[in-house]
């Protein structure tokens, strides 16, 4: 397995629409494993393939839950060629962050419950009603496959302030090296 570089805003590749995964081969399995390793190291709870420069409809999620001893219990989930449909009108506000928009967080309103269809890493089809944090995370990562970032859900003013702060912090980090 290998750590992959994570693209950060304003990289234009983050705005690309991802294409359907058609071949479920060893290369895909390696990419999935590398994406999990990269996500865990970052650390994060979700990662879309486009965030590591691969414009395929693939995302990985792990909503790691700490156990009593403090160790995180891994629950890796792979979603290939996902399709999401909101269920009902209820929305949920969640403070989101993104590995491609480092150290920046903002509240985003998304449907509380979704119906999801996807393929797993072996190409098997699944369909499930999903709610809670997994629904939020899945919608966030799904946006990446369409070239959308969580900051696009913010007002222009909030987005501008967040980007200004991000670029200032990035410059400070670069100047300290």
From Swiss-Prot:
Manner of cofactor binding, per the entry note: Binds 1 Fe(2+) ion.
Required co-factors: Fe(2+)
Ligand binding (Fe cation): 98, 140, 144
EC number: 3.5.1.88
Keyword Protein biosynthesis found: yes
RNA-binding as UniProt keyword: no
GO molecular function: metal ion binding; peptide deformylase activity
Cross-referenced PANTHER family: PEPTIDE DEFORMYLASE (PTHR10458:SF22)
Name of protein: Peptide deformylase
């Amino acid at each position: 397995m290998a750590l992959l570089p994570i693209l950060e805003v304003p990289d234009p590749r983050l705005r690309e629409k991802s294409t359907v995964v058609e071949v479920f081969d060893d290369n895909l399995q390696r990419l999935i494993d590398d994406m999990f390793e990269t996500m865990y190291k970052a650390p994060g709870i979700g990662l879309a393939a486009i965030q590591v420069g691969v414009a395929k409809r693939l995302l990985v999620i792990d909503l790691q839950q700490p156990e009593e001893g403090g160790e995180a219990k891994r629950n890796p989930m792979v979603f290939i060629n996902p399709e999401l449909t909101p269920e009902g009108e209820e929305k949920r506000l969640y403070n989101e962050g993104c590995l491609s928009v480092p150290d920046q967080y903002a509240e985003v309103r998304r449907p509380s419950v979704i119906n999801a269809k996807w393929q797993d890493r072996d190409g098997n089809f699944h369909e499930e009603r999903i709610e809670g944090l997994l629904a939020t995370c899945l919608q966030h990562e799904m946006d990446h496959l369409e070239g959308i970032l969580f900051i696009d859900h913010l007002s222009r003013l909030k987005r501008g302030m967040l980007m200004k702060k991000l670029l200032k912090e990035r410059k400070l980090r670069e100047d300290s090296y």
